[in-house]
Amino acid sequence: ADGDFDLWAKAVSYFRGRLDAEGLAGKVELVGPDAAIWGPEEAWWVSRSRDELGDRIGLYDIHTYPSKCTVNSGEYTRILEAYRREVPAGKKIVMGEIGFKFVEPADSLLQAENLRRAAAHPNASTDDSQMFVYDPMYGTDMADALFQTIHAGYSGCIAWMLDDTMHFKEAPDKLKIWGFWNIFGDEIFGAGEERVRPWYYAWSLLCRTLRPGSDFFAADVRGAAGVKAVAA
């Protein structure tokens, strides 16, 4: 809908009606508003979805690509809470996509390095790649973001993304490098690209530990600056 809420809401209402007409009422729920946000200012996407679409939305979600400084400072929690507050009672909200983009001035050196690495890589999209997936730092930052997502009251989170070969941008051989690996490394892009990247270990450990159906509790860490925690 390219930011047009009215157009999107009209499509949702039509699609919900078609599902119900096919006997799928109560069997298939719609997720929305699926908005990509950068700060708390876009929380109206959730509030308007709540007020104008009602039960046509079964599960709420947003996408976020925060800057490293936003997450590490804890500001990320406050941004997410603005959206959670707009979710109606009895409904849940999940993070439909999460990854890091160095969009804040404080992270300008990281962005410069990200662009340098992408330009030097023969198969990286220079417009849409996160080249720090090769660094352990990205794993700890993604864990930090997940903990804050939990603390903000979200019920699920999907990492962007599984495999580099899912998407390309400027050309078919210019991949959006964001994945845990590149499954076609050995065949096309170089055997080293199939190697599991460091952030996979952080994310997979959390997936195995924070099980579906768990109850989560806020954890206040004192005396250890920079350490984040969650209790389940």
Label each region the model flagged.
Residues 3-152:
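Noncatalytic carbohydrate-binding groove/subsite architecture in carbohydrate-active enzymes
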Residues 1-4, 8, 24, 58, ...:
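Residue-level signal for functionally critical sites in structured catalytic/ligand-binding pockets
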Residues 100-229:
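Aromatic/acidic polysaccharide-binding cleft in carbohydrate-active enzymes
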